[in-house]
């Protein structure tokens, strides 16, 4: 079946046809590194990580670009407020973002370009746009003339004359208030670079147009980002790139937000939850399940209850995996192919919720096989489950999740040794028919957050939902 994606520019789901057979090129608007990431920031990277994994499963060679905006009004403002170099703030938060992507199992991008490393490409794009009458210089600033580009606002389906005029932000010399800055003239205390129009720094929109062209050429398959980027950022990217002569992106894919009390999670609103804090409270694989399993175009309303539900749901999957591994006496390799129903769901606009339902159905079938002592059927179901979880980045047997944190594997071994000692005491009590003591030990372990299951191979323990 052909992969189908919702294309924002077409406002409908379209069959995906790659520019080059067997290859997929993706540009994802990455982090503006003025602060450490909250889970809303990371959701976008995680959604497109699942997209990438699915294309790779389907046999495509994927080139995945995720940029870093390391110079920006907010970074400069924070530099002034905190008395720290702008580049130090950017680098510190870039590392925090990469830590967030890594801890939640996102594959590294093919390239991760920084805006400040591509000033030459930006200057060349501005020079061409000025020569073609699409941009102009005024008081050291370079603006894009939106009326020179008739296709402007087609992505967001707006009319230019109905567009609210921006407040201005101190910009001077504009021909039209809706023209946007490609280059900002130097101001005291700000970082600057030399250009034919004087020293200054790049505008946000120019950065992405130039970097997409540098790494993916004049045309590429998919441009991604959050819904909030459709206007003005992606509209302005399109205007610059197409006026420059690029075909630019052929599909536009946007993910929905994480919300809190119905509002988009945002540091400025004070309703954000940092990834670094979340992983202290929740296992990273549970966070990935929580953020990655809703459909990418559906909002996620943040709540502790929803996280606990995700934890319980994943525990059912993980428990099945552990039981079959014990039954099989070793690791069961994933199937080379996922079940057809799972593939059909993923091909249909990355239908992760429907695909996940197939995972849970297969887990139930596997549990029934275990209950019937049908080892062969249980192993076959686990192989299918591992194949599906691998596509979603949720296979608990993947080395990515071994330990889940600093020294996690060592810690698990220590805890296992201690719990086994207690379970041995419980087994001794059961052998003496001292049921009261055996039950008391089990209850104490349960109160500690452990689930004890008695099996023909002896007792085993797992972490229970909180």
UniProtKB/Swiss-Prot annotation:
It catalyses: tRNA(Cys) + L-cysteine + ATP = L-cysteinyl-tRNA(Cys) + AMP + diphosphate. Binds 1 zinc ion per subunit. Its EC number is 6.1.1.16. Zn(2+) binds at residues 29, 208, 233, 237. GO terms for cellular component: cytosol. The keyword Hydrolase does not apply. GO terms for molecular function: ATP binding; cysteine-tRNA ligase activity; zinc ion binding. It is found in: Cytoplasm. A motif ('HIGH' region) lies at residues 31-41. A motif ('KMSKS' region) lies at residues 264-268. It holds the Pfam family tRNA-synt_1e. GO terms for biological process: cysteinyl-tRNA aminoacylation. Keywords: Aminoacyl-tRNA synthetase, ATP-binding, Cytoplasm, Ligase, Metal-binding, Nucleotide-binding, Protein biosynthesis, Zinc. The keyword ATP-binding applies. Its main location: cytoplasm. Its cofactor is Zn(2+). ATP binds at residue 267. Belongs to the class-I aminoacyl-tRNA synthetase family. Monomer. This is Cysteine--tRNA ligase. It comes from Streptomyces avermitilis (strain ATCC 31267 / DSM 46492 / JCM 5070 / NBRC 14893 / NCIMB 12804 / NRRL 8165 / MA-4680). The gene is cysS.
